[in-house]
């Protein structure tokens, strides 16, 4: 444990853009309350159980993982501590849901994306502000930020009231293909591979749908990770936002016929 803490602290010193240091997402640090204005929480409507994270990309639209979909769910914006109702938080319902169904040059691994139109726009405040879509694709070796209300212990299921943040590295896709042979990942894909190969830092269950932010840009959506979480040499998979920009922007613009990306 002492060694893990030392390694984590050395990594943190190298992260120039991070607003708050994180040792581990599993048992790690609480996100700075001003760091996640775009992070939303999805809840199952009837049970009021927490499902997933998501990202507010403008006042009326949220991007999350398709596997987070339920027949009825709620979206909370501006939340920090889930156990306390905050004056500035806002609740919305899905008005429309869109799923990425393009077939050309996209495999099943490239389609875990859901775009949600809210029933009414949110009002920006000091705790609510959208995160812009990326202007360019991410580079391997980038330092990336992940956050969410997912498990802080694994395999034990411990969910925190506040979001936890961590810094991980964007890895070459081949690293995930080699490390995760049971998935039989295709030779080429539009998913991102990210993690800390030494282990101890990772997203986990219920972090699904949340953002992967690399060098300050929204580059990925939490998609899949090994169980237990944070194992050495077991990185996780993220949907690549940049390769879905045409689809996202076409829907937001109101196009009824969406052209699939090349």
Curated annotation (Swiss-Prot):
EC code(s) of this entry: 3.4.21.-
InterPro entries, sorted: Peptidase_S1_PA, Peptidase_S1_PA_chymotrypsin, Peptidase_S1A, Trypsin_dom, TRYPSIN_HIS
Keyword terms of this UniProt record: Blood coagulation cascade activating toxin, Disulfide bond, Glycoprotein, Hemostasis impairing toxin, Hydrolase, Protease, Secreted, Serine protease, Signal, Toxin
Range of residues in the leader sequence: 1-18
SUPFAM superfamilies noted in UniProt: Trypsin-like serine proteases (SSF50494)
Compartments, record wording: Secreted
Origin: domain of life: Eukaryota
Metal-binding among keywords: no
Gene Ontology molecular function, alphabetical: serine-type endopeptidase activity; toxin activity
Active site: residue positions: 67, 112, 208
Gene3D superfamilies xref list: Trypsin-like serine proteases
Tissue: Expressed by the venom gland.
Propeptide part(s) removed at maturation, as residue ranges: 19-262
Pfam families referenced in this protein's UniProt entry, alphabetically: Trypsin
GO cellular component, one term: secretory granule
GO-annotated biological processes: proteolysis
Cysteine disulfide partners in this protein: 31-165, 52-68, 102-260, 144-214, 176-193, 204-229
Domain Peptidase S1: 25-253
Family: Belongs to the peptidase S1 family. Snake venom subfamily.
Subunit structure, interactors included: Monomer.
Anything else known: Negative results: does not have phospholipase activity, does not aggregate platelet, and does not affect the release of the neurotransmitters dopamine and acetylcholine in the nervous system.
Function: Thrombin-like snake venom serine protease. Displays a specificity similar to trypsin. Releases only fibrinopeptide A in the conversion of fibrinogen to fibrin. Shows coagulant, esterase and amidase activities. Reversibly increases the permeability of the blood brain barrier (BBB) in mice. Induces the barrel rotation syndrome in mice, which is manifested by gyroxin-like, rapid rolling motions. This syndrome may be due to its effect on BBB permeability, and certainly also to other actions affecting endogenous substrates present in the endothelium, nervous tissues or blood.
Name used for this protein in its record: Thrombin-like enzyme gyroxin B1.4
Record organism: Crotalus durissus terrificus (South American rattlesnake)
